[in-house]
Curated annotation (Swiss-Prot):
Official protein name in the record: Microtubule-associated protein mu-2
Taxonomy, superkingdom: Viruses
Locations listed in the record: Virion; Host cytoplasm, Host cytoskeleton
Any GO CC annotation of this UniProt entry: host cytoskeleton
Alphabetized InterPro entries for the sequence: Reovirus_Mu2
Subunit field text: Interacts with protein mu-NS; in viral inclusions. Interacts with polymerase lambda-3; this interaction stimulates the ATPase activity of mu-2.
Stated consequence of mutating residue 208 to S: Loss of filamentous subcellular location
Protein family per UniProt: Belongs to the orthoreovirus mu-2 protein family.
UniProtKB keywords: Capsid protein, Host cytoplasm, Host cytoskeleton, Host-virus interaction, Inhibition of host innate immune response by virus, Inhibition of host interferon signaling pathway by virus, Inhibition of host IRF9 by virus, Interferon antiviral system evasion, Viral immunoevasion, Virion
Gene: M1
Organism for this UniProt entry: Reovirus type 3 (strain Dearing)
Gene Ontology MF, one: structural molecule activity
Length: 736
């Protein structure tokens, strides 16, 4: 059975249900036995009655958990005195678990009003001792619904309930005036048989449910045009709070299901509907619906080539794992010989990018992991390579489940990980008019220590001199490291014991303020040396502990002009590694592939298509009326981009229909103009409630993983005053 929710109420006849479906564009050429309607008119009365004593949101949030395919009913008990009177008149109705002394008295054929023992037993009697679970006037709406979903009969002492009809336990005379006159549609008289949920292939009802198996909501419904205010209120709340867990279904799919045709699937929601119903379907998906986060990768085989006296010698055979095919195509890499060093001995950008995008190297002779020496000085230095082949082509998902929400990203890399070089390369990559990773969108944890006076590294240096009992930095280095630059374990342990309170008392408080401020300025990529740095600073973004296929300590030694020199940086590197947690690191390539590969895939898909029809933005919307109150010109509404999107036109049109306004933030618009074009002012945003789920954006669209919060100004008027606003997400596209 499938349950289809449509925002309307009709009589509970199959002909009316079919007519209702046809009004939504469904071709319901089916027999009456195939489609039935659950008349939820009584629920509207209950909803109106409940809103007098409960918050609307609580009632609706409870009702959306009702399983409409499960038969259940409330059984309304009379007041205690009337219940005992009914039992006295009908001894056979007395439950078995009633106190035997009370039962014995009730079965006496005499007036009990002056019977002292009976009166004492009646006063001690509690209805809740006999009927459990029992709904009362203090029961929450969610508890009512949970009890309905668990059983078929739920006893209640109040008619202020929601989600099922009310069956009278006794004749109406025993209830006197306790029943609401507005609830007549809900009441089933005593002795009348309760109708069960019809077993049809398709049940049509008014209210969506996240507890009903195979529940679908008719897509394309204009909520604002719903005539019934209570149904409109329900759908507004459901679309705002529960939109991501409800299943939309198109009239086309409903038509095919009713007419027993093979389903013609056009959209992801239709495909999910077919899968939930376990029905075969034709995939009618064009080039517009391609999962751009599925990326083809290969393992690249290459040899380290040494040339001496005109003779070619292969000193090592290596495999570079999980190299994206799109990157190889972009760089024009093929089977050939390459020099991977620049004139100054540094690695070329293309080779550095290729290795960073991979999942490491393996020596084909020893089958062990191989870490490259970044130095150009022997031994074990690589100058020239010969690419000999590509094997093991397969597809990977570069957007795993850990990226559940659109949030900042914290990337933890050890010192000497080429962060500056990689960010310079990424800053230069622009695809479809979008900068992949602007340098302005990157924050380094070193900035926290550099804001101190003295800096964190200077403070550490002076304290360590005292521990070692030396006056100079050179003597400190000699005290910690042996001649092979390997630290003495006991002495490094002493330094680490001093490092912990410094990190806790000096670094962490400053880091909390720093990250609170930086994360309000945008969704930024934050680099740190140890994950403990971010954890102790209450960092709330995605936290990734990463590694690279290079010997980072060697890279530290060839970097000049660093605080304290190369050897002191090496000591700090050891300390940060001790400071990190025991979480297993992933390859840096797992993040870089997510940053670059989907965009290259999308570039192939939309090619030369009109950018106006393939571009969109999701951002915080501020009505111009609110801005004008703070001195802004009001030429247009305020809009602070949160996510920039590139996708085929059909995907953009689908995204336009989603409910973005359910996500909101406290936005501060400043009067500080940002240097550059277009004209804009900086802003801050603190998200309230849930973050934007990644799956809402769609796997068929590319979106920016970082953003800097700025409000664009389309005119040359003077800026207004800085102020805070409550803003909701809005979708902007030239197609709207």
């Amino acid at each position: 059975m499938a349950y289809i929710a449509v925002p309307a109420v009709v009589d509970s006849r199959s002909s009316e249900a079919i007519g209702l479906l046809e009004s939504f564009g469904v071709d319901a050429g089916a027999d009456a036995n195939d489609v039935s309607y659950q008349d939820h008119d009584y629920v509207l009365d209950q909803l109106q009655y409940m809103l007098d004593g409960y918050e609307a949101g609580d009632v609706i949030d409870a009702l959306v958990h009702k399983n409409w395919l499960h038969h259940s009913v409330y059984c309304l008990l009379p007041p205690k005195s009337q219940l005992l009177e009914y039992w006295k008149s009908n001894p056979s109705a007395i439950p078995d678990n009633v106190d035997r002394r009370l039962r014995k008295r009730l079965m006496l054929k005499k007036d009990l009003r002056k019977d002292d023992e009976y009166n004492q037993l009646a006063r001690a009697f509690k209805i809740s001792d006999v009927y459990a679970p029992l709904i009362s006037s203090t029961t929450s709406p969610m508890t009512m619904i949970q009890n309905l979903n668990r059983g078929e009969i739920v006893y209640t002492t109040t008619d202020r309930v929601i989600g099922a009809r009310i069956l009278l336990y006794a004749p109406r005379k025993y209830y006197a005036s306790t029943l609401s006159f507005t609830m007549t549609k809900c009441i089933i008289p005593f002795g009348k048989e309760v109708g069960r949920v019809p077993h049809s292939r398709f049940n049509v009802g008014t209210f969506p449910s996240i507890a009903t198996p195979k529940c679908f909501v008719m897509s394309g419904v204009d909520i604002e045009s719903i005539p019934n205010e209570f149904i409109k209120l329900f759908y507004q709340r459901v679309k705002s709070v529960h939109a991501n867990i409800l299943n939309d279904i198109s009239p086309q799919i409903v038509s095919d299901m009713i007419n027993r045709k093979r389903l013609r699937v056009h959209t992801p929601s239709d495909r999910r509907a077919a899968q939930l119903m376990h029905l075969p379907y034709h995939v009618k998906r064009g080039a517009s619906h391609v999962d751009v986060y599925k990326v083809d990768v290969v393992d690249m085989l290459f040899e380290v080539v040494d040339v001496a006296d005109g003779l070619r010698n292969v000193s090592r055979k290596l495999t570079m794992h999980t190299v994206p095919v799109c990157i190889l195509e972009m760089l024009g890499i093929e089977i050939a010989d390459y020099c991977i060093r620049q004139e100054d001995g540094m690695l070329t950008d293309w080779f550095l990018l290729l290795t960073m995008l991979s999942d490491g190297l393996t020596d084909r002779r020893t089958h062990c992991q191989y870490l490259m020496n970044p130095s150009s000085v022997p031994p074990d230095v690589i100058l020239n390579i010969s690419i000999t082949g590509f094997i093991n082509r397969h597809t990977i998902d570069v957007m795993p489940d850990i990226y559940d929400f659109v949030k900042p990203i914290g990337a933890v890399l050890p010192k000497g990980s080429f962060k500056s070089t990689i960010m310079r390369v990424l800053d230069s990559i622009s695809i479809l008019g979008i900068q992949i990773m602007p340098r302005a969108h990157v924050v380094d944890s070193d900035e926290v220590g550099e804001q101190m006076e003295p800096t964190f590294e200077q403070a550490v240096m002076e304290i360590y001199k005292g521990i070692a009992g030396v006056d100079s930095l050179d003597d400190l280095i000699k005290w910690v490291l042996n001649s092979d630059l390997i630290p003495h374990d006991d002495r490094l342990g002493q330094l680490f014991q001093a490092f912990l309170p410094l990190a806790k008392d000096l670094l962490a408080p400053m880091a909390r303020k720093f990250y609170d401020n930086s994360m309000s300025e945008g969704r930024l990529l934050t680099f740190a040396h140890a994950d403990s740095e971010l954890l102790n600073a209450n960092y709330f973004g995605h936290l990734l502990r990463l590694k690279i296929p290079y010997i980072t300590e060697v890279n530290l030694m060839i970097r000049k002009n660093r605080e304290g020199g190369e050897l002191f940086q090496l000591v700090l590197s050891y300390l940060y590694k001790m400071y990190a947690t025991s979480a297993q690191p992933k390859w840096f390539g797992s993040l870089l592939r997510l940053l670059i590969c989907p965009w290259l895939h999308m570039e192939k898909l939309i090619g030369e298509a009109d950018p106006a029809s393939t571009s969109a933005e999701i951002g915080w919307h501020i009505p111009r009326e609110q801005l004008m109150q703070d001195g802004w010109c009001g030429c247009e509404d305020g809009f602070i981009p949160y996510v920039s999107i590139r996708a085929p036109r059909l995907v953009i049109e689908e995204l336009m229909e989603k409910n973005w306004g359910q996500y909101h933030a406290q936005v501060i618009v400043t009067d500080q103009l940002v240097v550059g074009e277009p004209r804009r002012v900086s802003a801050k945003a603190v998200i309230k409630g849930n973050h934007l789920p990644v799956k809402l954006v769609s796997r068929f669209a590319c979106f920016t993983l970082t953003a800097k919060y700025e409000m664009r100004l389309s005119c040359g008027h003077s800026t207004g005053r800085g102020a805070a606003y409550s803003a909701r997400l809005a979708f902007r596209s030239d197609l709207a």
